[in-house]
Amino acid sequence: HSFIQMSKLPNVKGRISYITSHARQENLYATYRTADNAFWNNLARESRQEFQRSGAEGKCIEARELIIALPEVYTQYEPQQVLEDFTDEFRRRYGVECVSALHHNKRKTNYHIHLIFSERKLLPEPDVKIATRSVFFDETGKRVRTKKEITGEDGQIRKGCTIIKKGEVYESHLFTVKDDRFKREPFLREVKEDYTNLINLHIENPEQHLKVFDKNSVYLPTKKIGKNNPKAEEIAADNATRQEWNRTADMALVSGIEEAKILEIKQTEIHDKVSQSIKSE
């Protein structure tokens, strides 16, 4: 099956530096950008400013990243062309800027693309807000109504608080708001199907074509073991158990047992028991 996963990026500039650095990546074959560093610097700054103004808890998400595993047959193709084809496909479909890199892991067993994308687009013109009266911001960057709310007991403005005077710019936007579709399940499902089809276009043997994993099938998915994963042995053992179930399911199908019956056993013997185990902890 194809392997495509998505993650949130609280530090997009740091992540871009990491995936595109030959000094930090042992097997880096190609990099590609659809926008320059200024775009990503501005995106990160505006995302943090908006997050501060919102007063929301947790981490500020500046961008998102896809990891797309490629079959080893792809090592035969020109790396830069592969990377640009996959990145341009995303930009064509969703109209957002991207940075990407094509890697092998240290043992050269996992050929994959990192594709970072923005959830926002540049506005045609910056949206600049001018203060019609004095505007006050507290230490967290949150706007407050009165000067009194940022004044200390000594009558002075508290450290870290700011005042924007009438006629000055108090807020500016270079970007649109985030596109909500990128955090919804249908988007990731669509991306998986789209990239699986793109991968298969360059695999001549139909028997080697990849499929998007169907969670409603008789099979169990295996998990990717990342670099320096402290749970590597545990995941490997779990994968072995899952592969044993998948072989058993294959044999059952070949021997003529109906798929519905296998799904019933999968539900009662695996999903239900795991659910009960979690609830009893």
Predicted features along the sequence, with ranges:
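N-terminal nicking endonuclease/strand-transfer module with a His-rich metal-binding environment
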Residues: 1-281
